[in-house]
């Protein structure tokens, strides 16, 4: 192999938008310059002692490749700072800022990166494992970008270059009260403690006129292993929180086994909105929830067509200690005190221990796209089909209910003509009560959630991305505390969180996201957005439900990411209602991390607080 061929391999991979890659490809040869020199010597010298050595090497390779694979002889890790000083695209005017940021940031340790990749020296060279390893690294909170490629050697083996860039890992994130726009809390987090990939965080805030605070710790490499560990402790508005988990997730598409153990204790308020004299009034019912699960999943099949089978033991214990109270003192007047007597049914003690059987089918592939949910960065997008089912039978000796839980989930996504990306997800769960009276409906606590999304970008160079999303949620035949609200927490960003209540809800959103590229694109990414949200709720016969007309809101916002090309996006939105009541003076300000709508689908928090959903197979996929 000639030296020109080596340079061709080093420069052949495509550039990643938002990051300069050519200089990295030119730095990688610093590791391979001795290799190029040896190639020149091997190519120009006649067969002699050196030639005999080469012949011996070929014979050694032949022996090594009898099993049909070429080996990896060397793995080089080349990790770059948040701002790479050799990047010619950086603005020299901000050299002081780049240097200051790099000095504040501790680089990721090489051993941390090596543990995340799926291959080692001496193993077979597999392009698929290289691609999976790239996604694993990019999926972490401390790596902004990863590029892995191999260089074939004269002896038939491969040198593999792992080229990574660190993510800025220290964050101070404010929490804004959507009702008044004031500061309601702060969170300080470090996602790469001392370059080890460990996450630590502390937060403080106000909730229901009570001071809350806590701390969290997480690591993807517990005690130097491939185990994920998480721990969180907090003071809540009416008690304490403790959560701990230890898991071994599927690593890429080649992983066969995954398991998880988790325990949780949480004191919280279940918040109801009830009709007052001229508005909806918040009433709080104290709830204490404890849960545990331990289980494992096995995958069989080939990449792109995987079947998942698993089992778990899951338990949940819920009590409702103490009496209800108003969230706002001004509501505690003589005319509204009787509202506290409207205690919803089903605030009964729950004790459940069940065996859960899991099954699923995963037929997915990944593509890379730019400026979808990131301002300008490149993201991994999962396409294909994934379906799952979980059946959980209660153990009567340890449970207050005799039932069977059923959970179904389907997730599809694909590319359509014209540069359109779209997808949808449906979740459905319920329980069959074997102790239900004769001639009554046995299925109860049926909850459903459906989400659909679409992205359209006129061209890869366009500064605009149009995003549409539809979300719907509902509950049927509920015997547990349950209520949905329609407002800014559910997607209508120009409304207060308690605009309407009910048992069903649907929201449609449309956004035009655009990259501004000003004032300092070499220092941070800045983009804007214009959006419209339309939605309504349905009472569904619910005692605390309303049945209003459609609501609508419009707004604008800013999106920013630091450093340029980062996938972590911060957003600031200002929205006003245009239908269903209110006016320009009733604007709502919201601040958050990540986009408000899109393909990053989340479980509806108001469904989850009422649901007794057991484990699902998708929880073990990483990255999912």
Model regions and ranges:
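C-terminal transmembrane beta-barrel domains of outer membrane proteins
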Residues: 3, 386-624
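Bacterial N-terminal signal peptides
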Residues: 29-40
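Periplasmic polypeptide-binding modules associated with outer-membrane biogenesis and secretion
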Residues: 46-190, 201-205, 210-219, 232-243, ...
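Outer-envelope beta-barrel architecture signal
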Residues: 69-73, 158, 168-170, 182, ...
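Transmembrane beta-strand segments that form the barrel wall of outer-membrane beta-barrel proteins
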Residues: 117, 150, 168-178, 184-207, ...
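Outer-membrane beta-barrel channels and translocator barrels
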Residues: 120, 143, 167, 193-195, ...
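Feature captures outer-membrane beta-barrel proteins of Gram-negative bacteria and organelles
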Residues: 184-193, 211-224, 242-253, 261, ...
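Transmembrane beta-barrel wall of Gram-negative outer-membrane proteins
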Residues: 218-324, 342
């Amino acid at each position: 192999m000639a030296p020109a061929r080596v340079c061709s391999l080093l420069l052949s991979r495509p550039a990643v938008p938002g990051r300069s890659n050519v200089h990295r490809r030119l730095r990688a040869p610093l590791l391979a310059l001795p290799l190029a020199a040896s190639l020149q010597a091997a190519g120009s010298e006649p067969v002699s002692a050196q030639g005999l050595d080469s012949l011996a090497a070929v014979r050694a390779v032949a022996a090594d490749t009898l099993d049909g694979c070429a080996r990896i002889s060397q793995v080089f890790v080349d990790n770059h700072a948040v701002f790479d000083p050799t990047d010619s695209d950086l603005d020299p005017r901000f050299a002081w800022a780049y240097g200051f940021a790099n000095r504040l940031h501790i680089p990721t340790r090489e051993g941390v990166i090596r543990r995340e990749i799926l291959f080692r020296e001496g193993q077979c060279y597999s392009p698929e494992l290289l691609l999976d390893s790239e996604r694993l690294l990019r999926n972490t909170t401390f790596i902004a970008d990863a590029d892995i490629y191999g260089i074939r050697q004269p002896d038939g083996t491969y040198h593999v270059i792992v080229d990574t860039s660190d993510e800025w890992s220290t964050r101070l994130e404010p929490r804004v009260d959507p009702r008044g726009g004031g500061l309601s809390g702060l969170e300080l987090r470090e996602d790469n403690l001392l370059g080890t990939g460990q996450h630590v965080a502390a937060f403080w805030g106000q909730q229901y006129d009570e001071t809350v605070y806590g701390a969290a710790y997480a690591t993807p490499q517990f005690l130097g292993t491939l185990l994920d560990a998480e721990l969180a402790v907090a003071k809540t508005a009416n008690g304490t929180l403790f959560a701990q988990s230890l898991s071994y997730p599927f690593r890429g598409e080649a992983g066969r086994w995954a398991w998880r153990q988790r325990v949780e204790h949480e004191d919280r308020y279940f918040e109801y909105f009830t009709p007052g004299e001229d508005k909806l009034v918040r009433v709080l019912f104290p709830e204490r929830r404890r849960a545990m699960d331990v289980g494992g999943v096995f995958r069989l099949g080939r990449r792109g067509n995987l079947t998942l089978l698993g089992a778990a033991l899951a338990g949940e214990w819920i009590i409702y200690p103490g009496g209800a109270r108003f969230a706002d003192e001004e509501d505690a007047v003589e005319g509204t005190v009787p509202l506290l007597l409207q205690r919803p049914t089903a605030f009964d003690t729950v004790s459940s221990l069940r065996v859960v059987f899991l099954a699923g089918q995963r037929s997915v592939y990944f593509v890379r796209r730019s400026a979808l949910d990131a301002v300008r960065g490149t993201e991994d997008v999962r396409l294909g089909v994934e379906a799952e089912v979980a059946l959980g039978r209660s153990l009567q000796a340890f449970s207050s209910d005799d039932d069977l839980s059923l959970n179904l989930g389907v997730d599809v996504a694909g590319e359509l003509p014209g540069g359109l990306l779209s997808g949808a997800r449906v979740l459905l769960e319920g329980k069959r009560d074997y102790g239900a009276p004769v001639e009554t409906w046995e299925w109860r606590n049926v909850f459903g959630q459906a989400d659909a999304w679409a992205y359209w970008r006129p061209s890869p160079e366009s500064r605009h991305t149009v995003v549409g999303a539809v979300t719907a949620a509902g509950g049927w035949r509920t015997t547990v505390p349950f209520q949905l609200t329609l407002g800014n927490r559910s997607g209508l960003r120009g409304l207060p969180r308690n605009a309407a209540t009910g048992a069903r809800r649907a929201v449609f959103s449309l956004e035009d996201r655009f990259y501004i590229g000003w004032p300092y694109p070499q220092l941070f990414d800045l983009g804007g957005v214009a959006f419209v949200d339309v939605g309504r709720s349905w009472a569904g016969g619910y005692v605390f439900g309303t049945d209003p007309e459609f609501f609508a809101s419009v707004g604008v916002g800013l999106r920013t990411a630091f450093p340029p090309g980062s996938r972590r996006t911060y957003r600031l939105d200002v929205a006003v209602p245009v239908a269903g009541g209110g006016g320009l003076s009733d604007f709502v300000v919201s601040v958050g991390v990540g986009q408000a709508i899109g393909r990053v689908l989340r479980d509806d928090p108001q469904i989850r607080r009422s649901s007794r959903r057991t484990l699902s197979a998708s929880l073990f996929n990483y990255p999912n």
